[in-house]
Amino acid sequence: MSHAPGFLALIEAKRAQVREVSVAQARDRAAAGARLIDIREQSEWAAGHASGAEYVGKGVIERDIEGRVPNKDAEIILYCGGGFRSVLAADALQQMGYTNVVSMAGGWREWNALGAPTEA
């Protein structure tokens, strides 16, 4: 999928403010208790997602996250399809006071390509 230049510029600007982790790091951190949150569209989630992930769509994450993860120091790993939307969502959560939120680089495509565990 080709992305518009303005969108890519926004992502790059936000990437400078958001920490990213690899799929391997995300798996290790999730196994140690971090919250792994899939922010893709509901149809993407239903087609398959990372084992152990929970769903909070990007369209509602700012509205719903405090009810799902009230501890603003909790470790949160966000992922989307390719690692772009999750950067934007991580930035938004940081602005809301979450101190330990990261974006998983490469997103679902990288998770799947590496053969990490999935469920549907």
Predicted regions and their residues:
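Rhodanese-like catalytic fold shared by cysteine-dependent sulfurtransferases
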Residues: M1-R35, Q42-I77, G81-A120
